[in-house]
Amino acid sequence: MAKRTFSSLEAFLIFLLVMMTAITVALLTLLFVTSGTIENHKDSGNHWVSTTQGPTTTQSSPTTQTPTTQTPDLPPSQNFSGYYIGVGRADCTGQVSDINLMGYGKNGQNAQGLLTRLFSRAFILADPDGSNRMAFVSVELCMISQRLRLEVLKRLQSKYGSLYRRDNVILSATHTHSGPAGFFQYTLYILASEGFSNRTFQYIVSGIVKSIDIAHTNLKPGKVLINKGNVANVQINRSPSSYLQNPPSERARYSSDTDKEMVVLKLVDLNGEDLGLISWFAVHPVSMNNSNHLVNSDNMGYAAYLFEQEKNRGYLPGQGPFVAGFASSNLGDVSPNILGPHCVNTGESCDNDKSTCPSGGPSMCMASGPGQDMFESTHIIGRVIYQKAKELHASASQEVTGPVLTAHQWVNMTDVSVQLNATHTVKTCKAALGYSFAAGTIDGVSGLNITQGTTEGNLFWDTLRDQLLGKPSEEIIECQKPKPILIHTGELTKPHPWQPDIVDIQIVTLGSLAIAAIPGEFTTMSGRRLREAVKKEFALYGMKDMTVVIAGLSNVYTHYITTYEEYQAQRYEAASTIYGPHTLSAYIQLFRALAKAIATDTVANMSSGPEPPFFKNLIGSLIPNIADRAPIGKQFGDVLQPAKPEYRVGEVVEVVFVGANPKNSAENQTHQTFLTVEKYEDSVANWQIMHNDASWETRFYWHKGVLGLSNATIHWHIPDTALPGVYRIRYFGHNRKQELLKPAVILAFEGISSPFEIVTT
């Protein structure tokens, strides 16, 4: 074997990794020595700094939906064939500074402002007689953590008793890679988040619960209509060589290596008035790449924004009665970067199997979207998705009728025996991540010289792992083959387990529609196999012609799920299939059992399974809270760079203010926006809000200085729809004030730009 030499860059990266790992292990060891307790999900999770809510600014804006904590009875049963329908939407943005963005796993990709707010969108559907109901919640996050779900269910139980439960509530993430991290309890994700943020966790939980509260309050009789159609020109398979590992006979049944079908539910009241929309479609929200530092909802969020703005005329983004949820599906190997991978340094094509370049290696092989930049690519992909949903929504005519039925189990996914046939039984494995996990994907490469498709370990990395984390057992090595194990997460338990063992599996049916809530990212072919198996199981026991949709990234996150054949190639998705080569077969067996129980009315006979843990004393953020300071002679909100006197459509207004850390505002759930764009209306002699920070036309940048100093820069990209007139920009923030020997307080402030004019010539 030839002696391996390292470049100066690789040597530096290795040194950096060793130092970071040593520091991490030391911190974990310290925490484990001092704490490390486990509680069940009845724990509140509030073990950190109490939030101090300061006064908030009063803004003129359209009335927002207000939830109630009461549990009103449904109206007396009426003679209608539909469902009681309730929709609700609430802000769940969390921190937009001093926190990592979740998804790419790129060190240093921390939040530095806001492009759009993140929303939780809840849809409640109840039988006409009130006998059963379900709540489907699409949340603009990278994934749902087990801790989030347990805390949401706890709060719902305290408000509504047994009305909303683990079996009839689905929390599904859209999978934006531009949302905040910090809301996890398993060690691997805490390390990726650079600590647990109770501030963000509480904000997200409250937003999810509030969206359900609003939907619950708004329940009214209505109908559900379903439609399906294909979406073109928004997807590619980012691991086509893995897809080709699947049997030719199976691939021949499909016209594409991605699922192009969108399923849309149109929700209307008994008068036919629109209430909301749910769509499921498989594409990664990674049009915004890993150079981005602005919190946003990416392409699926832009589709939801366009739909809601069209239906909620006269309302600001995030407000209005109509709610549009663009939910994820089996997107595991599906990219929106449709121009495909190429070597960014030479323009050549990448090696298809390894996603690497002749010059520069894997870090040079990247895929790009259809736009001139990531913002334009997001708009292009999101608009196409919106337009197809709009078309399907307008033409939907097939009504969904039938009872609401639910089934749920907790399963130890590290110990599932799978009956492949009459003579062969296999098992899942303790969790582990393979080498190609560290390679990243063509949507977001890593900086390490590790390629996708790696099927053999490396002596250096194996030795480093063994010294820092201990050696993986022979059992896990054999079980995970042909995956070369980089991190044996299932055998690491200090200070808490590194990845989950206990996983939620869940099916909810609405008449002839079945929603399979999957706890991760199924690849295209994995999703097809699961849908087909569940549909056949329903048909076998009398529920024929079911439409099965996959709700991706639901309830708990367990990385990827490839087919057995794709697993052999060990590209990124396979290396991230943590429970081993038979993970998909295990899920198919488990979901078939749920389908059978629903179809045979035997759900009550099923075991609930082992309850997941709820950990206390998690590693907090390593970024301290420090007092904000304004420059000498200035106050928070003062203008440092004014707007120009005059602008035209298509230009960008830029105003710079004396700022404060925007994470302070995440401690105040009533904080609605960091900015407004306002137009002076002569007819009422007052300023009217035209845009807020949920608008895609605005951008809020936070520039961190030293010793508590910072600036806030607000951009308004003037749209074609802007009318001539006089405008201004307002900035809303909160500063942390710390006096000696006194607790910190959070104080609200605002800044106002000088007026400027939009002209036509």
From Swiss-Prot:
It holds the Pfam family Ceramidse_alk_C. Residues 1-11 are cytoplasmic. Disulfide bonds join C343-C357, C350-C365, C429-C479. Proteolytic cleavage of the N-terminus removes the signal-anchor and produces a soluble form of the protein. N-glycosylated. Required for enzyme activity. The keyword Mitochondrion applies. Pathway: Lipid metabolism; sphingolipid metabolism. Ca(2+) binds at L115, D693, S695, T698. Residues 43-76 are annotated as: Disordered. Plasma membrane ceramidase that hydrolyzes sphingolipid ceramides into sphingosine and free fatty acids at neutral pH. Ceramides, sphingosine, and its phosphorylated form sphingosine-1-phosphate are bioactive lipids that mediate cellular signaling pathways regulating several biological processes including cell proliferation, apoptosis and differentiation. Also catalyzes the reverse reaction allowing the synthesis of ceramides from fatty acids and sphingosine. This is Neutral ceramidase. It comes from Rattus norvegicus. The gene is Asah2.
